[in-house]
């Protein structure tokens, strides 16, 4: 094996090339690789945080939805109670108004009946007076009396 100057020159050139690469090429490559590794690690950490945040947000949304349903049910229940109360109040007021109208109607009927009775008494009294006048005008005849009384009864 022959060691000639070419082999030594190539070895020296290779050593200079390796030194040059280690000094000027290798550090920027390592920095780029480390930066990429850091970005990937940060991205994975952010993804994990995002997943956890999403789970928390979903749990919170579920809780809020449950609370909203409970609140809605309470509001509906209160509305139904209020509706029943209003209906009951309306029934009570309607019953009171009905009783008032019935009492007023009965009072009006009673007043009208009393007025009619009074008018009837006046008419009966007038007829009795007219009958007595007719009886007195005629002679005192039992047949005539009976006839006049029958006419009065028919008029009444």
Swiss-Prot record:
A cellular component term from Gene Ontology for this protein is: proton-transporting ATP synthase complex
Q: What SUPFAM superfamilies does the record point to?
A: F1F0 ATP synthase subunit B, membrane domain
Q: State a single Gene Ontology molecular function.
A: proton-transporting ATP synthase activity, rotational mechanism
The record's section on InterPro entries has: ATP_synth_B-like_membr_sf, ATP_synth_b/b'su_bac/chlpt, ATP_synth_F0_bsu_bac, ATP_synthase_B_chain
Q: Give the superkingdom in one word.
A: Bacteria
Q: Membrane spanning segments where?
A: 7-27
Q: Which UniProt keywords apply?
A: ATP synthesis, Cell inner membrane, Cell membrane, CF(0), Hydrogen ion transport, Ion transport, Membrane, Transmembrane, Transmembrane helix, Transport
PANTHER family noted in UniProt = ATP SYNTHASE SUBUNIT B, ATP SYNTHASE SUBUNIT B', CHLOROPLASTIC
NCBIfam families named among the record's database cross-references: ATP_synt_b (TIGR01144), PRK05759.1-2 (NF004411), PRK05759.1-4 (NF004413)
Q: Identify this protein by name.
A: ATP synthase subunit b
Starting at the broadest rank, the lineage of the source organism is: Bacteria, Pseudomonadati, Pseudomonadota, Gammaproteobacteria, Alteromonadales
């Amino acid at each position: 094996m022959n060691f000639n100057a070419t082999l030594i020159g190539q070895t020296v050139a290779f050593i200079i090339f390796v030194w040059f690469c280690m000094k000027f090429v290798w550090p920027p490559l390592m920095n780029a690789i480390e930066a990429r590794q850091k970005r990937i690690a940060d991205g994975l950490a952010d993804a994990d945080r995002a997943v956890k945040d999403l789970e928390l947000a979903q749990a919170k949304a579920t809780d809020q939805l449950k609370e909203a349903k409970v609140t809605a049910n309470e509001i509906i229940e209160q509305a139904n109670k209020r509706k029943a109360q209003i209906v009951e109040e309306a029934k009570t007021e309607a019953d009171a108004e009905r009783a008032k109208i019935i009492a007023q109607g009965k009072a009006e009927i009673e007043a009208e009946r009393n007025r009619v009775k009074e008018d009837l008494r006046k008419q009966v009294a007038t007829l009795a007076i007219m009958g007595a006048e007719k009886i007195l005008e005629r002679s005192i005849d039992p047949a005539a009396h009976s006839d006049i009384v029958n006419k009065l009864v028919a008029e009444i």
